C-alpha cells in the first residue's frame, strides 16, 4: 500500500488539502462538503478555537480576536495577540495546518503524518523555514516544500501540455509570482521566477476599502478608520464587491447601521463600477507585468516565445488581468483548472510521486535568489572590501551544491569571517545578509592561504554553508535556516504543545524520527550496516541532514517491505552519497 502524503496549499486568503489517489489528484472536503478553508483563526465568545469559515464569519463582529492573512507575516519576528495570548505567525499557521490535517484524516479514514506544502516562488529562506516549522508544530513531517507556480504547472502538464514554454501567472491573496516553465518529455522545469511576496488580492481589497472610507468622509462627514468593527465590515463588503466585479460591470456596496455619530446611525450605500475599480488596481497589475518581463529576461525569452499563459490564484479572475496579458502576449490566458485549487492539486501530485505512485512529471525547481559572500575586490573601478561574489546564481536548478575558493590577505592570518548574502547587487551590503560565522585557528601561512567556501541548497531553499582551510581540513559550518529560525528545538516543542492544547487531546502524533513500534528494520547485511551507520550520524547531523537521513532510512525500510529492489538500490545509493558528504 502506497503511503499517503497530502499536498497542502497554505494560502494567504484560503488554504486547501489534496491527495493523489486513483491515478489523479483530488482536493479533500470537510464534513460540510467544502474544499476551501479560509486562512482565518479566531477565538469564540466561550473561548473555543475557531478555524476557517467560522472564524471568518466572526471577523465582522470580533476583529480583535480574529486573525487573517497571517501568511504575510511568515518569517518575521512579529507577534499576534489572540484571546489574551501572544502567538508567532508559525503558530497561527500551524492551527490552520492542523485543521487541514483533521479534514484529510476524516476524509481518508487514516492518520496523516506527511505533507508537501507549497510556498510562493519568491519566498525567502526565512519564510520557507517558518512554513516548515508551522508544519512541525501541527504534527506534520514536511517532506517537501515546492513553489506554488511549479505545483500549478504540474497540474496542467497532466492535461498533456507537452513541449511548451509556459508563463504561470500566480496572483493570490497576498503574493504574486511570475514563473517561466518549460514542459517537455514529462519533465516540468522552472526556468525562472520573479515576483513580490507583498502583492495580491488583499491589496485590491484595501483599495476598495480606502475608496469607501473616502466616500463616507466626503459624503457623510464620518471617519470610521479608527473603528475596528466598522472597518471589518467594510473589508468584508470590499471583498464581496471585488468578486462581483469579476463578472458584472457594477457592484452595490451596502452596510446598514455601520456606526453611530452623535447618536445618529451611519448607513453605507455606494455603487462601484468596474472601470473605477480597475483604475484603482491598475498600478498593481502593471507591477505584475514588470515582474513578468524580469522573469522573461532571466529565461532569455521574449513574450512571443511563450506558448501558454496559465492563471493561478483567485485574484486572477479579475478581467483586467486577462486583458492586459492578452495585450502583452497576443494570446488568451488559460484558467480552466480552478485557480483556487490547482496549487493544492499540484502539491498532491508531488506527494504521490514521493510516496511511490506513478505520475507523469518530474519537478525541476530553481532558486529565485543568488546566494554568495563578500570579499575584497573592486566596485565601480575602486577598491572595495565588500564586493559581492555570487556562488549559487539565481535560477539555478535545486538541489545544488557549489563551492568557490578564497584566499587570506595577510601573512599568518588566524581568522576569516564569512558572511552569506542573498541578492543580486554587486555591493554585498546592498543585499540581504542571511548568516555569518568565523573560522578561527587557521595555520600559520603566507597570505594567499586558500579557504574553500561551500554552499548546499536543498529543495526547500534551506542553505548549508561550510568554510574549510584547504591545507589542513579545518572546517566550520552553519545551517542558515537555524541561524534565521524563530525557534530552537525546545521552542518548537513548546509551540506544538500550545497548539495541541488549543485543539484538545488527539491521537498521539509521532514526530519524524520517533519510535512507533515495529520499524521493519533492514536485515540484509550491507544495507543493515548502511542504515546503522546513518542512525549513528543522527545525533551529530544538522537538522536538515538529519531529516534527509531519516527520510532515506524510511524509504529503504519501505522498499524492503514491498520487495522493491529498484527503489531499494536508488535509496541505498542516495544514502551512501549523503553519508560520504557528511564525512568529508
Show where each model-derived region lies.
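Oxyanion-binding/catalytic loops of NTP- or PPi-dependent enzymes
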Residues: 1-76, 80-86, 95, 102-584
